[in-house]
Amino acid sequence: MQTLGLSGESRRSDGRLKSIFWPTVENAWDVNYLGQQGFWICVVLAAIQLVVAAFSSNLVVLAAYLAAGLVYLMGGMGVRESSWPAAAIVFGIFFTGLLYTVMMGHLPGIVDVVITCILLSNVRAAFLASEWKPAGEGEDRPTRFSETMMDKFVDQLPAKLWPKIQPFFFAVAAALFALELFGAGAVAWHRSSGLVVAPHP
């Protein structure tokens, strides 16, 4: 069974909901499934950033959303290849954006909170996958398919690109994370100094 490239479900240890919010890794199928799942989560986030950017007339905002979309997409490739640092920085960028919203005096929406929890769970999944070792050399493992465009996108592209784009990803992601952290810190400092008036309800 294959849904959006999420294959090997019959041998997974967890149900779908648990794998999203509290994943565990007991075999190679768990590693493969969680990598695919984390990849799609990041791809969806990247698509959202691009949609928002498409409707923005402010060049600074446009550039910020395009950069975030690129980082989420590349980070998804890292997650597919069991890179927990990639998952961690994707979570950090999204969480810092949420923190900025709070600092501006707005409560985050339910969807934002759920996405934050999923991204944090993504870090756990990537870490567990990176630490998992097969019991033996000949242990059965899921196949990475390449028959369809979806297979190539989910199973083949991350494996080919991630080793090459890692330095670029971490450089861009670190810069974006630092800018967001600086922005949230600046807003917090101004608010504590009384220089920013809280919005009226």
Predicted regions and their residues:
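Topology signature of small-to-medium multi-pass alpha-helical membrane proteins
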Residues: 2-200
